[in-house]
Amino acid sequence: MSRPAKIGATAALSQLQGWAVVSEKDAIGKTYLFADFNAAFGFMTRVALMADKLDHHPEWFNVYNRVEVVLTTHDADGVSDLDVTMARFMDGIATA
């Protein structure tokens, strides 16, 4: 598999809504709020299944109904199209 090309956080944000630059590194982040823990965990489960398919895994933190996500591509040393793909998937299922 070829190494993903770095596009950078700014380019990624121009394609997404509600995401922000993570200041410590070339990454993007978003916080999702759900009705309760079960909804948050269901979201994380669906994302985990997609992450395995893409072989691209998020950094995240969960407390009750809140899921904080950070996306970056380690092989690209920054944000790549894989992060945009994952972010769009997350946004799509978070509102479903």
From Swiss-Prot:
Entry-linked SUPFAM superfamilies: PCD-like (SSF55248)
Q: What class of enzyme is it?
A: lyase
Q: Which GO molecular function, any one, fits this protein according to its record?
A: 4-alpha-hydroxytetrahydrobiopterin dehydratase activity
Q: A single GO BP annotation from the record?
A: tetrahydrobiopterin biosynthetic process
What does the record give as EC number? 4.2.1.96
Sorted alphabetically, the keyword list is:
Lyase
What chemistry does it catalyse, as a reaction equation? (4aS,6R)-4a-hydroxy-L-erythro-5,6,7,8-tetrahydrobiopterin = (6R)-L-erythro-6,7-dihydrobiopterin + H2O
Family assignment from sequence similarity: Belongs to the pterin-4-alpha-carbinolamine dehydratase family.
Q: What is this protein called?
A: Putative pterin-4-alpha-carbinolamine dehydratase
Q: Which organism is it from?
A: Caulobacter sp. (strain K31)
Taxonomic placement: Bacteria, Pseudomonadati, Pseudomonadota, Alphaproteobacteria, Caulobacterales
